[in-house]
Every structure is written in C-alpha cells, then in structure tokens.
C-alpha cells in the first residue's frame, strides 16, 4: 500500500480540480497515438488514425480519452486503494485486451505533458514530483494483473 501525505493528496486534488476530463482526456490520448503510434494497434475499431488531424478529429479517440480520465478520477477519489479500485480494469487490459503494460507508463508520460502545458508555472517541480508518484502508482495498479 502506498502512503500519501496530506500534502500529496492536496496537490493531486488541487491539480485534478483544474482538469477537464473530456478535453484533457482527448488531448492525452491524441498525444499518445501521435507520439507513440504503435499504441494505435489496440484500437483497430476506432477507424481513421492515419494522421495527427485524423486522430484529433476522431470521435472515438475523444470518447476513450474521456473514459481514461474517468478511471483516473475514480483512482483519485480512492487514493488509499488505487490498486483495488483499478483491479477490474487491470484484469480487462491483461486478460481480454492483451495491452502491453508499458503503454500505461507512456500514457502517464503524456498526461504529465498535458498537465504541464495546461498549468504552466503552477505545475512546479514539486507538483510534478507528486504527480510522477501518482502516475507510478497508477501504472503499478494497472499492471498488477499481468503475469
């Protein structure tokens, strides 16, 4: 179990209050597909992902980005049991979707970029440090069901 200080929880929640789950989720998934194009292979049902413009304009990318940040929202509301909160999602990605768990780390990286761009100077090194810890906890929780 991860120990969160009251200050860390406050930092996570303070940043999260500024997040637009729909817009920022779309931005994060769009970035993932553009920066790491091989991650698109898990999304063959999404249709046209042939260019940055096609990815950015794809309604399925938009909807799935929102869904991803919705799961992160759930984890933030359950910081003391992120692994338990994301257990079913981990099982699904490991056993049904067969997603390479390294992609969770990549998604975390692009989310950090999205948050940094959105918050500017407010995303200080100290804030980033807390968010890097949170992303590591997310990645660990989502990777838990892999053998």
From Swiss-Prot:
InterPro entries: Globin (IPR000971), Globin-like_sf (IPR009050), Globin/Proto (IPR012292), Hemoglobin_b (IPR002337), Hemoglobin_oxygen_transport (IPR050056). Keywords: Heme, Iron, Metal-binding, Oxygen transport, Transport. Heterotetramer of two alpha chains and two beta chains. Red blood cells. GO terms for biological process: hydrogen peroxide catabolic process. Belongs to the globin family. PROSITE patterns: GLOBIN. Heme b binds at residues 64, 93. This is Hemoglobin subunit beta-3. CDD domains: Hb-beta-like. It comes from the Eukaryota. Residues 3-147 form the Globin domain. GO terms for molecular function: haptoglobin binding; heme binding; metal ion binding; organic acid binding; oxygen binding; oxygen carrier activity; peroxidase activity. One of its GO terms (cellular component) is blood microparticle. This is a tadpole (larval) beta chain. It comes from Aquarana catesbeiana (American bullfrog).
């Amino acid at each position: 179990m991860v120990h969160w200080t009251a200050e860390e929880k406050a930092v996570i929640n303070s940043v999260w209050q500024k997040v637009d789950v729909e817009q920022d989720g779309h931005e994060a998934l769009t970035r993932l597909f553009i920066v790491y194009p091989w991650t698109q292979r898990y999304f063959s049902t999404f249709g046209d992902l042939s260019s940055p413009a096609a990815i950015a304009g794809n309604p399925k990318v938009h909807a799935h980005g929102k869904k991803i940040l919705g799961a992160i929202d759930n984890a933030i509301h359950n910081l003391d049991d992120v692994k338990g909160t994301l257990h079913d999602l981990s099982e699904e990605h490991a056993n049904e979707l067969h997603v390479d768990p390294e992609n969770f780390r990549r998604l975390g990286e692009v989310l950090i970029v999205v948050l940094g761009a959105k918050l500017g100077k407010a995303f200080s090194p100290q804030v980033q440090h807390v968010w890097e810890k949170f992303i590591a906890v997310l990645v660990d929780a989502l990777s838990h069901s892999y053998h």
